[in-house]
Amino acid sequence: RLMESLKNHGIKAKLLVRDKQTDQISVVELKKSWWKVWQFIWERVVIWQANHFKKHNLFAVDIANTGTNITALPEFTQADVIHLHWINQGMLSLTDIRRIIQSGKPIVWTMHDMWPFTGICHYAGDCDKYATQCHNCPQLYKGSRKDIAYRTFQKKKKLFEGAQITFVACSRWLESLAKKSDLIKGQTITNIPNAINTNLFKPRDKKQAREKCHLPQDKKLLLFGSVKITDKRKGIDYLVSACKQIASSYPDFSKELGVVVFGNQAEQYASLFPFPIYPMNY
């Protein structure tokens, strides 16, 4: 989305990814190899070991101990500005990020979760240890004073010392949390909401849209979406509770309502709603 917008404004831009899912020539995939698969597996093995060989939150944390050195790639050497996004699970290691910093190129890092300014977690929940020093991580099976969250936090702190990175949050909420972290203290932290291509996403004829999506014409529809509906952080439980309150307080009105849900595992919640649910199965 950002790349296309930049290109439309006359700026040359390329997107470097671990796994390419488009045929656009401006999207460049890292070279396929079994080494990439092993990097992903090895990071999980290290986390699994640090987690006392428990699967607890095995994919909820990342330590960035494996990755690819991109600084020798032509896409990197030709670039004037490096814009990082979500770089985990074998894309870039902390060592690779250090190489990027040492290149001297201006760096912008758009944060899509909390990982850039915490030890190992993507969402800290009620934990605020990232504000000073991660340790006794609640997302580990048995955290300790110098657990893997502590050690990764220390590595990141050394990594960011002397670096000049502009951290961009996609929401004011994430910006406010980032500014609390001692990890990126002194760095530029700002907020730029996710852009929307209004040439593509724009008001259209409602009747035609419902026909195309096989949705009823005679109901008022609520829309809820998440990559994984069962992820408690996304708020599906709040929506179910609110819908039940509506059905209880306004039984006649609730007959006119329906819920459109896009995201994985939407069908699991169908029986919990007091009125029809229409899974889009994104």
Set out the residue ranges of the language-model regions.
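A conserved catalytic-core segment of Leloir-type glycosyltransferases
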Residues: 8-81
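Acceptor-binding helix/loop patch of EC 2.4 sugar-transfer enzymes
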Residues: 35, 44-56, 109-156
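A short, active-site helix/loop in glycosyltransferases that binds the activated sugar's phosphate group
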Residues: 118-123, 143-191, 196-206
